[in-house]
Amino acid sequence: MLWVGTFGRGLLKLNLKGNDINRILLNDEIRYVNGIAQDADGYIWLVTEKDGIYKSIENKIFPNLRFSLWEKSNKNNHYCLHKDRNGGLWFGDNKENILWVNPTTGETVIHQLPPETADSAVTAAILKLYLNSQNHLWIATEKGIMVYNHQTHECIAAQPYTKEFKKITAICEDGDGTMWLGTEKGIHRANCKGKQIKFTGGYEKERNLTPGKVLALYLNNYNQLLISYTDKIIQIDGKEKTVS
């Protein structure tokens, strides 16, 4: 299934194995959707640019499905959203706060990165979150990238942005456990080396393509990473780590 937010204040749910398309018209007050997730109970969650977190009132999909502002969100905050492999929802905001939600039980846990464990060089408004198979939370901010152990509340590694490595726009893990970061300057492979994070780029140049802003990353069932740019889509083999 693929969820798409449109510029016409609507949602599309696409079944890539068939021809089914579900269209949902959003409430008038919902604009600039930053993330979409459907929980295990069928409810749809939306995060917005500056209108807070919304949850569908019903767990059935139909064109006039209504959404309400989630009671634990701040309407003035900018949020990002990540759904982990266990169905948990992770929300990051522009106030450096992280909120984990079990949508089935309603349990919530707030993570505030403490100064003594977080790296101040990268601590800033949160743009992207990703919980990997090692149960480490990758946090992309306006200043850089941090790997955080949410169980011990420790910063494992961190790296500020550089001239060659700019703002992170997407995060994904392949089937071998390798982390990939989409940025405003192309795709990069990431590896933790002690307290630092090392990046490997240049994948676009393997096919004589110009590195551009990555819009989205998607890993299919064949361990192939699909990378969407503003003007192209390329594929990286998750095993060989090469453009295929």
Regions found by a protein language model. Name each.
Residues 1-244:
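Carboxylate-rich, polar loop motifs that coordinate divalent cations or form catalytic acidic clusters
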